[in-house]
Amino acid sequence: NFNPVIHLKTFTFNPFQENTYVVYDDAGQGVVIDPGCYTYEERQEFKKFISEKNIQLKAILNTHAHIDHVLGIDFVKNEYKIPLHLHPKEEPVLLDSKNRAQVYGFPHYQAADVDQWFTNDEIISIGDLNIKVLFVPGHAPGHVAFYFEKEKIVIGGDVLFRRSVGRTDFPLCNHEDLMNSIK
């Protein structure tokens, strides 16, 4: 019985201490979730890991489009020639990211175009990875979580934190939606 294993690498990037994930299978087929790498050093650290592990990235999957989660999208898209996937309700948030970048002091941020819009409960299959897209709005209008059912792993973006829940004091956030998503 061959039982494939998935591997998960977490990076903490940018002044917001955002978590970026690389998830890949034994054959090296993988995805990057929420690339927040902004500085040259962060991008070099990311590239070094991908190269050392010989990972073939196939897609960028974003839980949402707040500035801390999108700072590295343009870099990753251009470096690895892979598509960006995002929920359609995040479009206004992504469109506002250039303004947010200026407000928060990221002058070199480049917004990236979305290549594929998520559908609710979509299953993304890449190599041995089967990733279910769960619509969990509240922290952001089109926030999604990624559920690796077989492994019982959820990557929830900013829905939950240790002993806390995601903030809802940003534009387009909704506390009631967040509570319903968590349930």
Set out the residue ranges of the language-model regions.
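Conserved beta-strand hairpin/beta-sheet module of binuclear metal-dependent hydrolase folds
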Residues: 4-53, 145-157
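Short acidic-hydrophobic surface loop/beta-edge motif
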Residues: 11, 23, 120-127
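Short Gly/Pro-enriched turn/cap motifs at secondary-structure boundaries
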Residues: 11-13, 107-108, 113-115, 135-137
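Hydrophobic "anchor" residues on beta-strands that sit immediately upstream
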Residues: 30, 60, 83, 135, ...
